[in-house]
Amino acid sequence: MSICLFWAVVAAIILLNVLAWNSAAFCDWYIAHIFPIWVNTYGRLTGIFPFSVGEWLIVAGLLLVAAALLIGVICGFFGLVRLGKYVRFHMAGGKAERTASSRNGRFFRIARCYYRFFSWTLLAVCLIMTLNCLILYHASTFSAHYFGEDDGSYTSVELVILYNMVAEKCNDLAEQIRRSDEGDAVYVSPDGTEICVRDAEGWSGGLAHMADEAGELMAQLGERYPQLAGWYPRPKAMLFSDFMCQQYMQGYYFPFSMEANYNDVMHILNIPSTMCHELAHLRGYIYEDEANFISYLACVESENVFFQYAGYLSVLNYLYNDVYKLWKTNPEAYEETVAVVQPAAISEQVWKDNIFVSDQEWDRINGKALIDTEIIDAAADVFVDTNLKVNGVSDGKISYNRVVRLLLQYYRKN
């Protein structure tokens, strides 16, 4: 019976993936009607815990794999020993040999039980990944849902105008947000709690208010874009945020726990947009450029100037890089563009705020790192790029940059 059930689940996983790759309509229906069930049940369950459940599930998974490898090595060793003793055992028939053989037999029975458990665990991982991640890659895009088809005919003038708007917003908001005596950005929660400096015990005052505000902003965005409506779990800080920094990762959506997780070691102005970005994945928008765009909208439409500033900062680099790329790859088109509209200058304060991790944190992280940050970053880049391409995102990590096209499309229509 268990074998039949195992292969039935395997068949279901294959069928779901075949359907997903061949029918966007099926994926859209699944995200609209089935996917929210997992968020509202399992997501609420894992949301009870104040820590990232997904993080510890990954640790447990690594331990299970390590145990499987260790048991495999031991089984191989015992197998060779048994092979070498086979003839002597039958010739001698000694008690000691029989006892050793009996003990080996018990170990192999335990090993079989463990591998049976490991097989079912691996099957569960494949099923959860299919239901909570892989199907999402083949659904209709956010822009197709709400903006219509993109004709792709955007001019360099439109790009620079959009860049100027974002740069000028950043310049303005950089002067409006509250700052400490040292000039560091300060988040002020609705109850007046200030969060600024991260010490050995974390952020002073905690980031719970910011996480709740991110969820509220996403729910408000759902009034205009129905697929974003509904309940959101509170984003959670990751215990292994130092390791996240070494990967240059700001956050993770864990399909195994239905959680939005963020790196709480990075600069505080990265955190609001990251929270909203990861929450966007919990509404079925798995593409990174779409999550970037949704996060941007949620932040800039906030009444909190800190969230607004964080939202504009989150896309500034993408726009700046595209303008720079225009200048480097097509100087003639760039000259024609600047004859119409000059790119705006970015203030020194914005450049100071526009960082991933502070120098002090980098010194601390690299000072205690077991593996060099460059090695971890390179490995993470390969993993993320490969994962995206396997799931049908042909340009891999470069797809993050497509948020610029979504911004151009949005502002043209609005």
Question: Where do the language-model regions lie?
Answer:
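Contiguous, non-catalytic segments that form substrate-binding/exosite surfaces or channel walls
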Residues: 91, 95-100, 104-258
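Hydrophobic alpha-helical membrane-insertion segments
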Residues: 5-21, 122-130
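Membrane-embedded alpha-helical segments of integral membrane proteins
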Residues: 12-82
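Pan-zinc metallopeptidase signature
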Residues: 349-414
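Short pre-active-site segment immediately N-terminal to the catalytic Zn-binding motif
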Residues: 254-275, 282-286
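Alpha-helical transmembrane segments
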Residues: 2-9, 53-60, 73, 111-122
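Active-site recognition of the HExxH zinc-binding catalytic motif
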Residues: 50, 273-292, 296
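Post-HExxH zinc-binding segment in Zn-dependent metallohydrolases
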Residues: 286-333
